[in-house]
Amino acid sequence: MSDVIQIRVDLNRPNFKLYCDLVLPGRGITILYGPSGSGKTTLLRCVAGLESSFKGRIAIGQDIWHDSEQKQISPVWQRPIGYVFQEASLFEHLSVEQNLHFGLKRSPSKHPLEHSIELLGIGALLERRPESLSGGERQRVAIAPALATDP
């Protein structure tokens, strides 16, 4: 993705206001940082499509993901983005391997899951159940499907 990323979010809630107007490169690494409660997670939820009750526009090159004026909102599953929640939610009744495959059912990938498993060093965890994983292991398992979707 070499296109420019345009993000304009204007969100007003009773105890929270977020206004952000950014133009970011479509390649490389961008870091979003700030104090607790400043809106980092909310902004990422807007980009991912998990929050849609805001005024503004999100576009990746010519692809418009959200435009409140035009009433155009792309569904979450149509956005090529990897999103990993702060709390790694895994299905406790499934093995790690089953959790990984479940997370990819709706998103055909160009990159095989095996590459993510190797990259994150979780191959030895595949037969284990989530309740036996440490917090860091759970997080790496949650990251693997996001990487495999080629975000």
Where are these regions (language model features)?
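Conserved ABC ATPase signature
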Residues: 129-133, 137
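Short coil-to-helix segment of the ABC ATPase nucleotide-binding domain corresponding to the Q-loop/switch region
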Residues: 93-103
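ABC ATPase NBD coupling module
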Residues: 65-82, 106
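Hydrophobic anchor residue at the start of the ABC signature
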Residues: 143
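The feature captures the beta-strand-to-loop junction immediately N-terminal to the Walker
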Residues: 33-35
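Helix-to-loop junction immediately C-terminal to a conserved catalytic motif
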Residues: 48
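Conserved ABC ATPase "signature" region
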Residues: 63-68, 108-125
